[in-house]
Amino acid sequence: MQSAATVPILEPRKVLKEFFGFDGFKGNQEAVVNSVLAGEDCFVIMPTGAGKSMCYQLPAMMMEGTAIVISPLIALMKNQVDNIRGFAQKSSLAHFLNSSLSKAELNQVIEDMLSGETKLLYVAPETLKKEETIDLLKQVKISFVAVDEAHCIS
């Protein structure tokens, strides 16, 4: 993960409770979150269910701009976005961008991105290569980029 954004004064534990409903961190999550908030590059290896996603989701909610999350599976993207929207109760905070979107859904993603409301954007690797995606991302402030699955890297 790489960061170039400024961090507001919010306390990570308060945001953890507000957006995700958790009272505390698991394992090394807090150290990773603090590193991301400090603008440090991070490489995180955790087993399934250990809370890797929180390591980028929480900083994204706290930082200025939109975090780009590269994720290979449409179902995983949808699940992550649905979970965030469920706690935050604001659909514009998280979106995914992939081939499953209708034209109306795509237009809503673009509108929310350009308005600065979107904090997390999940993107499939093949979508990230498209010229229209690149053009959209050039118009928004990107807080950092996270690669959610190692097999997205080659």
Write out the residue ranges for each language-model feature.
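Loop/turn-to-beta-strand initiation segments
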Residues: 41-42, 65-68, 117-121, 141-144
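SF2 helicase catalytic motif II
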Residues: 118-119, 127-129, 133-154
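Conserved nucleic-acid-binding Ia/Ib motif block in the N-terminal RecA-like helicase ATPase lobe
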Residues: 67-68, 74-130
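Short hydrophobic/charged patches on amphipathic alpha-helices used for structural packing
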Residues: 33, 57, 107-110, 134
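Walker A/P-loop
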Residues: 39-58, 68-73
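Conserved pre-motif I regulatory segment
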Residues: 2-47
